């Protein structure tokens, strides 16, 4: 299911009692739905995999960000998607920001501007990671995380140029759901990272 959080809940409640394994590719799934999915997966011995992103590069980006985070004091994340993307920032951007902050073990420096000439120009801030979102035609999904420290920056970037980038992860999740009863959240768990 790749609809939305509400659709994901409906699919889980419909499929699990029928002993059908489930793969969900929606973001913004509330904790209550995750708890229900965990309960239903256990009760009916089915595999339920919920992954906010199926692009291997995006999953690896999140992992690399966590490794790099302790060595830097500043972090800015820019995400750009197609104009029909309904949420901002994207679920992947939120996951990258949260994982980056976890890797840091605290908050990054996010100094507010002394004078902001256009409101919101510096973006939103999540645990010190400043997040900027753009929506426009000609894009699929792009995430760029720039770390900063005295005299240096480190950039980690992932670009999904076409939706084909999601297929290897989807196929992996479908194959894994059959072998992995219970709830699994995130493709990183399947990859073992």
Segments from the language model and where they lie:
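Short amphipathic alpha-helical face segments that pack within enzyme cores
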Residues: 56-63, 95, 169
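Short, ordered loop/turn segments at secondary-structure junctions
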Residues: 27-29, 53-55, 80-83
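Short, conserved glycine- and acidic-residue-centered signature motifs
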Residues: 4, 8, 30, 89, ...
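Rossmann-fold NAD(P)-binding glycine/threonine-rich loop
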Residues: 6-18, 25-48, 59, 63-68
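General beta-strand structural signal in soluble alpha/beta enzymes
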Residues: 24, 48-51, 77-79
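C-terminal substrate-binding/catalytic lobe of Rossmann-fold NAD(P)-dependent oxidoreductases
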Residues: 73-78, 82-193
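Short glycine- and Lys/Arg-enriched binding-loop motifs that mark or flank ligand-binding interfaces
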Residues: 21, 53, 87
